[in-house]
């Protein structure tokens, strides 16, 4: 069964093709991605209207590229999947519209996929895929959550951010330091030259006794420190970047370890854009190795938004019998969409 996946939730256009035949994890046949980072740099952030227009320009050429790389034709596709949400409404509508139009033209079923489920399952495409059950740390620009995952479609929310996401803390702190967009990777690069102990920054909710996160206070502390430094900021920027990164990573690592202790599980999956952060990987690996915990990540090029994770999630849901294939081509998107029902929140 060939599944074509389309991702267009924010500022990356991704298309991929997987083979979900049989009971094995779907096999990635080909994928292509176009990032809009350069276009949005001039504005210091994502401009939704520009993002939508660029998705329109890119999605069909990327689809043709993916099919050519896989040596398959569109007529051979069995299911067309797309990101239904969460994300930017206009951007989501582009992917949904193209997916439904393609499926209708081909007479094939169409399927909406949850963006976060794609991230959560993306490590199954790695050379070291996880095994159920596991704890997942979903950490990106828009989300920071800890979940217990027993199988495909069974997700229990353990904790989440009550304000800013970790990726947002990276990006906003970088902006306060005058670093270019996207701020997170630039801050991480600069931090390599700095001393993470040079500034004492808060670790919000670190000792709260639950698994929730908060990063708004850290952002405020970075702003206060930047103002305090004044003209000296330029000379101390690397130290402030290192201290900021250390604070964010410290919270993510300790909360993840607390989740592992609470659940008693021995496998941790880290997914989302921030999962590519080298310091986070290093500290998690070291801490988990001491505790006999296996850590699984997506391949680095699949940490950010991509079509492969959408095609994979669709394929895995179909294999698990969680979807009934539909040929109705009216569609709606869900810019706000929780992956876990409220009642699934652990006490």
From Swiss-Prot:
Q: Which UniProt keywords apply?
A: Acyltransferase, Cytoplasm, Iron, Metal-binding, Transferase, tRNA processing
Predominant cellular place of this UniProt entry's protein: cytoplasm
List the EC numbers from the record: 2.3.1.234
The EC category is transferase
Q: Where are the transmembrane segments?
A: none
Asked if Signal is a keyword of the record, the answer is no
* Entries under Pfam families matching the protein: TsaD (PF00814)
Q: Which residues form a coiled coil?
A: none
- Name the chemical reaction catalysed here: L-threonylcarbamoyladenylate + adenosine(37) in tRNA = N(6)-L-threonylcarbamoyladenosine(37) in tRNA + AMP + H(+)
Under PROSITE patterns, the record lists: GLYCOPROTEASE (PS01016)
Gene Ontology biological process terms in this record: tRNA threonylcarbamoyladenosine modification
| SUPFAM superfamilies hit by this protein | Actin-like ATPase domain
Specify the superkingdom: Bacteria
- Record's signal peptide: none
Q: Quote the record's binding site residues for substrate.
A: 138-142, 171, 184, 277
How cofactor binds (record note)?
Binds 1 Fe(2+) ion per subunit.
| Cofactor(s) it depends on | Fe(2+)
Instruction: Fetch the HAMAP family from UniProt.
Output: TsaD
Give the matching PANTHER family: TRNA N6-ADENOSINE THREONYLCARBAMOYLTRANSFERASE (PTHR11735), TRNA N6-ADENOSINE THREONYLCARBAMOYLTRANSFERASE, MITOCHONDRIAL (PTHR11735:SF6)
Role summary:
Required for the formation of a threonylcarbamoyl group on adenosine at position 37 (t(6)A37) in tRNAs that read codons beginning with adenine. Is involved in the transfer of the threonylcarbamoyl moiety of threonylcarbamoyl-AMP (TC-AMP) to the N6 group of A37, together with TsaE and TsaB. TsaD likely plays a direct catalytic role in this reaction.
Q: What name does this protein carry?
A: tRNA N6-adenosine threonylcarbamoyltransferase
Q: Which organism is it from?
A: Polaromonas sp. (strain JS666 / ATCC BAA-500)
* Gene designation: tsaD
């Amino acid at each position: 069964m060939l599944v074509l996946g389309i991702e267009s939730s924010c500022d990356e256009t991704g298309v991929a093709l997987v083979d979900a035949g049989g009971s094995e994890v779907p096999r990635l046949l080909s994928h292509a991605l176009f990032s809009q980072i350069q276009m949005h740099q001039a504005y210091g952030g994502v401009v939704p209207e520009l993002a939508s227009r660029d998705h329109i320009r890119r999605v069909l050429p990327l689809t043709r590229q993916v099919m050519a790389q896989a040596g398959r034709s569109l007529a051979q596709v069995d299911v067309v999947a797309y990101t239904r949400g969460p994300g930017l409404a206009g951007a989501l509508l582009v992917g949904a519209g193209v997916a439904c139009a393609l499926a209708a033209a081909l007479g094939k079923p169409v399927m909406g996929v949850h963006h976060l489920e794609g991230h959560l399952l993306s490590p199954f495409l790695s050379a070291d895929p996880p095994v159920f059950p596991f704890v997942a740390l979903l950490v990106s620009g828009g989300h920071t959550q800890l979940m217990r995952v027993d199988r495909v479609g069974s997700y229990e929310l353990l904790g989440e951010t009550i304000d800013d996401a970790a990726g947002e803390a990276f990006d906003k702190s970088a902006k306060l330091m005058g670093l270019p967009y996207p701020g997170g990777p630039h801050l991480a690069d600069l931090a390599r030259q700095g001393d993470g102990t040079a500034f004492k920054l808060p670790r919000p909710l670190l000792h709260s006794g639950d698994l929730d996160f908060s990063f708004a206070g850290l952002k405020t502390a970075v702003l206060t420190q930047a103002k305090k430094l004044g003209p000296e900021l330029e000379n101390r920027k690397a130290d402030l970047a290192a201290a900021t990164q250390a604070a964010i990573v410290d919270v993510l690592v300790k909360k993840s370890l607390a989740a592992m202790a609470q659940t008693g599980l021995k496998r941790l999956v880290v997914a989302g854009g921030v999962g590519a952060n080298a310091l986070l990987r290093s500290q998690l690996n070291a801490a988990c190795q001491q505790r006999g915990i296996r850590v699984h990540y997506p391949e680095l090029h699949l940490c950010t938004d991509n079509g492969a994770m959408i095609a994979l999630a669709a394929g895995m849901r179909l294999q698990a019998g969680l979807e009934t294939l539909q040929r109705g081509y009216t569609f709606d998107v869900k810019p706000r969409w929780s992956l876990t029902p409220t009642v699934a929140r652990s006490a």
